[in-house]
Amino acid sequence: MKKKILFLGGAKHQTAPLIYSKKKNYYVIVCDINADSPGKKYSDKFYNISISDKQKILEISKKEKINGIISYASEVGSTTQAFVGNKLGLPSNPLKSVQTLAYKNKFREFLKKNGFIYPKNKVFSNYTECNNFIKKSATLPVILKPVDASGSKGISTIENLKNLKEN
């Protein structure tokens, strides 16, 4: 019986390990929110689901009796991979370590605690907190970035309070 590998994400830049796994005779399962994901054609089974939905991915992983889970070139999928891998006893990084690297607020706390230089920052739980801080304390411009987005996704530069919108 073929070993099963579940891949989190099937975007074009994620297809190389899918192709390799197929050549090595693995049963390839791909999960991607994009129903037309390029990786779909390289999979034995495809699930149209968000890779950030940890509980659903865990359910699928149990149902499929996977032997491994991979999040290739996806920061978003890395926490799901660690969560599922840890729950099922599969090779994986510790979830706490992955969360420290994936979430900017946790990473900055780690840097501060361990004596590293880190950028000045403030974490907000909601729009009102952010708005009040900027009105009372911040020197404009201010750069806002979600704690859980990778690269430049979700970055906003606030040059005046009119630019600040609730999202």
Which residues does each predicted region cover?
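Active-site nucleotide/adenylate-binding loops and adjacent lid/helix of ATP-dependent enzymes
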Residues: 103-167
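ATP-binding N-terminal substructure of ATP-dependent carboxylate-amine bond-forming enzymes
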Residues: 1-97, 128
